Curated annotation (Swiss-Prot):
Gene Ontology MF, one: tubulin binding
Subunit structure: Binds to two alpha/beta-tubulin heterodimers. Interacts with KIST.
Coiled-coil intervals, chain numbering: 41-140
Protein name, per record: Stathmin
Lineage: Eukaryota, Metazoa, Chordata, Craniata, Vertebrata
Gene (name only): STMN1
Amino acid sequence: MASSDIQVKELEKRASGQAFELILSPRSKESVPEFPLSPPKKKDLSLEEIQKKLEAAEERRKSHEAEVLKQLAEKREHEKEVLQKAIEENNNFSKMAEEKLTHKMEANKENREAQMAAKLERLREKDKHIEEVRKNKESKDPADETEAD
């Protein structure tokens, strides 16, 4: 388009900016369009070029498939590692809980045995004291009977 095809008409002028209108003149029939209306024709490809493009596409597909398989293998390996770690942590927790419970049970058993031994000792002491009191009473009783006569 030439500059004579365009007319500029000023609408407003303000401090914040300027507004204008562009008026395009109608196109003349003689003018040739600046761009082609249809896309450019592609040259005919030879059989070798088509074959090369197909081979390149096949290589891209294979490369993409290999990359996807590699990512899947890495993901599976990571999942196995995470699962193994979880199993190991669970086993460690179970062992620690079992050891703690065993230790607690042993401490309770020892405490119970100590309490039983202390009770038995107190009972023996009471029996001994009762026996002493009985002997003392028996030894005093015959003397009291002879004195009473």
